[in-house]
Amino acid sequence: MRMHNKIQLLSVLNTHLVAYPTPMNLNYSWNGGSLAGMMLASQMLTGILLAMHYVGHVDYAFASVQHLMTDVPSGMILRYAHANGASLFFIVVYLHVLRGMYYGSGAQPREIVWISGVVILLVMIITAFIGYVLPWGQMSFWGATVITSLATAIPVVGKHIMYWLWGGFSVDNPTLNRFYSFHYTLPFILAGLSVFHIAALHQYGSTNPLGVNSQSSLISFGSYFGAKDLVGALFLALVFSILVFFYPDLLGHPDNLIPANPYSTPQHIVPEWYFLWVYAILRSIPNKAMGVLAIGLVFASLFAMPFIGLGGGKFRIITEWLYWTFLADVLLLTWLGGNEITPITSFVGQCCTAYLFFYLLVCQPLVGYLETQFAHGTQTN
């Protein structure tokens, strides 16, 4: 008798990771889930090791990071593995989300899969932001000041929330301690949400490029797609190694190599690159409250996508074309978010933001509905 039949936990793992029936026509764009899980495990491991050397105090935080880099054996590799691992984690998850949008992977009956995925993305963003503050560099400090002050846009309770986040009347030691605590805790919540995400997916099974719910063309995941995922994992490990060992500061900001100074504001305050598209939307709207509302509306639209969209754009020509314009729009917003505000970048940012909402709130439901009606009319004739 096999061991996994004797031990319940091994039986569950075998059912969901080895014997799980998978459509045989999946391509490499379906590697995102396993690669994201690999990066989450890497981030948790390196984060726990970094926490052993980090000091959560405004007077020692920056020095403790420098001590880790110079005095701890392999400390530099550990720090850069965590920093660049966050970037690769977001790249993998963004590609995973974009694949889901393209193929309509969140369409009914898989709404819970999509919604739980958006929740995971939100928790990732919060975790990464508060982690960016911990080195207590110049950009960390001022980024925390700018982003936490957005809470004042909330009517009535906004200032109270901001002061609670700060733990006082400015970003200081209580803020750093709270962020350190949250940053250590949230990855474990992410792991739990990931398990729920997988469980929701396995309830109805994986989608496929054709969008056909077939129960006949299925093969076990472990024997075949495990090897395919291994190829993706090796490629990701190669990119990861190149970043860590050859270009460790490529995706970072040089101002964060300077200790935080509350009396000197950086010329251009920017978050990490994977938040730049959100930052560009926020900057394109002059009113703070409306900017925060716009960000909330973006994520509300993502939550509502299984209900307002009518499947992916793989076989819908207009939807597919609009999808690629949406992707170009997000990339342009990312570029704009990393540049200083000028009349031209401000105008282009407003145009890109307007198109983003036009795509999410108008194109998704309307064009999908019109294409469906046209297809039904063609079949009837």
Curated annotation (Swiss-Prot):
Q: How is the cofactor bound?
A: Binds 2 heme b groups non-covalently.
Keyword Protease on entry: no
- Its recorded name reads Cytochrome b
What does the function comment of this entry state? Component of the ubiquinol-cytochrome c reductase complex (complex III or cytochrome b-c1 complex) that is part of the mitochondrial respiratory chain. The b-c1 complex mediates electron transfer from ubiquinol to cytochrome c. Contributes to the generation of a proton gradient across the mitochondrial membrane that is then used for ATP synthesis.
What sections of the protein cross the membrane? 32-52, 76-98, 113-133, 179-199, 225-245, 289-309, 318-338, 345-365
- GO terms for biological process, alphabetical: respiratory electron transport chain
Task: Assign the protein's first listed, main location to one coarse class.
Answer: mitochondrion
Q: How does it sit in the membrane?
A: Multi-pass membrane protein
Positions with a binding annotation for a ubiquinone: H202
Q: Name one Pfam family in it.
A: Cytochrom_B_C
Q: Does the keyword Electron transport apply?
A: yes
Q: What's the source species for this entry?
A: Chlamydomonas reinhardtii
